[in-house]
Amino acid sequence: MPTTWIVAADSSRARILRVVGREHRLVEIQDFVNPKGRMDERELITDAHPRQETTAVEHETELFAKQIDRYLDKARVKGLFDKLHLVAPPKFLGLLRHNLGKETAKRVAEEIDKDLSWLDVRELEKYVVPRKARER
């Protein structure tokens, strides 16, 4: 049976979950937090940070997406998952997709463009585990 991971993320939090058992239960294996993803732009700007085309918040969000993608790329190389499901709001989903390594991107089986990172594990299962699998 292939190992499936779920990534439920937004600009301030990313949870990596593994699908286990015949009931397809989710087990959280990693929780990344990016407190800067929720900060106000003024809190991130310093005199040493000149104005650029991207805002400080956008820059921090991009760095966070890259951190998640590096983690996923390393996990793929180690053979920790076979299939990957990405769940994130559209803008952050685009960042994840853009930064994902080519071989890891081939493992993406599904993308859900919703912000579900804040849901508890059992609620999240309702969105990402197929109904047929839950009814077994």
Regions found by a protein language model. Name each.
Residues 1-136:
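Terminal alpha-helical anchor/extension segments at protein ends
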